[in-house]
Amino acid sequence: MTDKGPEPFATNIEVATLANTAFRDTLWTGKYLQLTVMSIPPGGVVGGEIHDDHDQFIRVESGKAKVVMGPRKDDITFDETVGDDWIALIPAGKFHNIINVGDDDLKLYSLYGPAEHLPGTRHETFADAAADPQETDLV
């Protein structure tokens, strides 16, 4: 899907999230907010990262995931298994990762405030995201 921001936009987020097959696809980028959808294969990860100046909201539409957070990668203080219709709120400055612990693709959407990725960012795979020089928050 093409990034529709910063113009006004409405969509059925469940349909858009479940239809997405890319690791990450940016649906909308505004001045202070960004919406992405993700599809993570079984055993795959979003990737450990820290957003120093971004809060993040994640909702799982389908699948089973382990959400870990903490001050640092080697100091995990939050570990929760989540599934369909669960959310995770990630404060700025927290290390976090999401691991698909289910047997099917994990389908989720994420809201960043402010925007985390360049408008129109699309990564077909985790490897594509890891190789993108614009993705500097992975740790």
Question: PLM features: what roles do these ranges have?
Answer:
Residues 72-92:
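Short acidic-glycine-tyrosine-enriched beta hairpin
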